[in-house]
């Protein structure tokens, strides 16, 4: 589970939750800690929007955050005619990044269940330096070059981590059929 807030609007926050299955998600909803949170939520949250995503790539290392840890949340609108080609370029790039770059701690890619051309990317880096190093890697530069014409819009949402907790060890999986 990851909790983030917008860097430019402290009143806007995001929760990123990954579950092994629908059953695991239902178990979470039935657990006492969630029920306690849900009971207090109306006093803390004035508006809530849930976006259900279809996972395409999940990969992470065990994260022990510190003051240098950074998060990126990016939304990319992919032109329908490039959906498959975009996916076939970006997912292997993410796997390579996670496997060979020490400072890349987590990478997730998913599409909106209601708009499959809207991609969400959530990334965690050990530091700003590690993120800048990632941006200079040949595989990342190739991804940018190869996909530049495939999107209609890219939105980078400025976020800061509030709470980062994972079990780590999700292998860099390109989700089949996702």
Regions found by a protein language model. Give the residues of each.
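Residue-level signal for well-ordered alpha-helical positions
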Residues: 28-31, 40, 89, 134-137, ...
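Glycine-rich beta-strand-turn "strand-cap" elements at beta-sheet edges
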Residues: 2-11, 36-70, 106-117, 142-178
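Short, well-ordered beta-strand segments in beta-rich or mixed alpha/beta enzyme
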Residues: 2-29, 67-77, 108-136
